[in-house]
């Protein structure tokens, strides 16, 4: 999101492939011409990819664990392999990176870690039981790590977005509602699949970026061990 420029840090842009990284850098540089952007191609959904990332950048001041996959599939069709793949990518990627980066942050006495979870972490989706389970687990991991930061200026939090207009979500919605325009498909998706949403639309990725940027800033020093909901009010609970 654009707000990351307020942090005045070098931003490492990670992706699974070099082409994806270059595409992201091109888009970001168009909007963030003054930002210090560095690309890193490594598949952090694997142990080898995380090792590449950690050896290339042994320490960071801010870690945003945004890597994740999802798929809509009935519980009885979710194989052991599907569960294991979801766990390896959605959970172990963040665990492997945080294990090294958090240690360095604690030694230096400052830092930020943010896990990008999901509203499915507190409102599990029956058509994505394995995905929802990993998103719930992220909340527990983040809170456990936050307990290790006592007496430092390090914070560990989770942000829980609702349905967000990413490339993957747009394709998913078009596959579910073929023959409709993108706008029509999005409206239909919200009406039929997320009817409790108070905003009644998909979330712009920049809106999530703004929240993450604030949580990573010095102004958010009192926010630690928290689950920050950014799901447009679709979860009907008070806390």
Q: Which residues does each PLM region occupy?
A:
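Substrate-binding pocket helix/loop in short-chain dehydrogenase/reductase
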Residues: 74-76, 82-87, 193
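Residue(s) in the substrate-gating loop at a strand-loop-helix junction
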Residues: 118
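Active-site helix of classical SDR
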Residues: 98, 134, 142
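Alpha-helical segment proximal to the catalytic Tyr-Lys
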Residues: 103, 147-148, 221
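Short, small/polar-rich loop/turn modules that mediate ligand/substrate recognition or access, typified
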Residues: 150, 155, 223-225
